[in-house]
Amino acid sequence: MHFQDIISTLQRFWADQGCLLLQPYDTEKGAGTMSPHTVLRAIGPEPWAVAYPEPCRRPTDGRYGDNPNRAQHYFQFQVLIKPSPDGIQETYLASLAALGIKAADHDIRFVEDNWESPTLGAWGVGWEVWLDGMEVTQFTYFQQCGGIDCKPVSIEITYGLERLATYLQDVESIWDLSWNAERNYGDIWLPFEKGQCHFNFEGSDPERLKQLFAIYEAEASDLIEKKLPAPALDFVLKCSHTFNLLEARGVISVTERTATIGRIRTLARRVAEAWLAEREALGFPLLEGGTLPSAA
């Protein structure tokens, strides 16, 4: 199954389960969780069901394209359902079957692994899903986002698309994965991977990155004060990515790392609080019986 067909198969499957199909969010982020379609929508009482592919960036994971299984840019497929439905593990196994992976023919294990994002002030309980000895999915019941208790609890399912694809295509290197019948993964992404790694590890200017972090932090704080949580989140995500770039350059001390994560977490908490207040002021319109505000 080609890489693009894995995405479309998961999209069809989760659409049939009642999920909205959305597109990737248009700023750098380290995980699909950081999209507002997850990190904001997991907060508050309104129901939500969404599925979307998400490109992710983790600068320190780059290896100039020389490692067959590690890259600073990769893809996840993200599912968030609130409240968490009954039988979600069985539904997930059915999604694997849709990809041609039948539970009866494979060793599929749910291994306890609680999840935490220090920068988002988010955590949950759940499992890693191992397929014949390889982790392919993270299952998380969100307990908090932005330091706010999640009521009701959401279920987040995050598929590692490259890992699934290497298994389904039986290849050793992600760069050899077929994207479709004509092009492979490396044809598309390897030039960007090499160039981005040079930037991440050698080409970026640490002092300029620190200046950018301060600008993004100030912008996020100002937007929160103006009660604009959605654009404020964009700048929190920019802070997070800029911090990751500074880590890749090796210019963040242990003390600075802890303090900087704390600054981002504080912003994330303030965004979450502002988002919840905004939705509450609207009367939580996605609740049954709620009404959407009329257009101005």
Curated annotation (Swiss-Prot):
Under PROSITE patterns, the record lists: AA_TRNA_LIGASE_II_GLYAB
Q: What class of enzyme is it?
A: ligase
Q: Mostly located where?
A: cytoplasm
Q: Which CDD domains match?
A: GlyRS_alpha_core (cd00733)
- Domain of life, per the record? Bacteria
Q: Which Gene3D superfamilies match?
A: Bira Bifunctional Protein, Domain 2, Class II aaRS and biotin synthetases, domain 2
Q: Which reaction does it catalyse?
A: tRNA(Gly) + glycine + ATP = glycyl-tRNA(Gly) + AMP + diphosphate
One Gene Ontology term of the biological-process aspect is: glycyl-tRNA aminoacylation
Entry's localization field: Cytoplasm
Give the InterPro entries listed for this entry.
aa-tRNA-synth_II/BPL/LPL, Gly-tRNA-synth_heterodimer, Gly-tRNA_ligase_asu
- Output the Gene Ontology cellular-component terms: cytosol
**Keyword set includes Chaperone:** no
Which keywords does the record carry? Aminoacyl-tRNA synthetase, ATP-binding, Cytoplasm, Ligase, Nucleotide-binding, Protein biosynthesis
* Entry's EC annotation: 6.1.1.14
- GO molecular-function annotation terms? ATP binding; glycine-tRNA ligase activity
**Family the entry assigns:** Belongs to the class-II aminoacyl-tRNA synthetase family.
Its assembly, as annotated, is:
Tetramer of two alpha and two beta subunits.
Mind telling me what this protein is named?
A: Glycine--tRNA ligase alpha subunit
Q: What is the lineage of its organism?
A: Bacteria, Bacillati, Cyanobacteriota, Cyanophyceae, Synechococcales
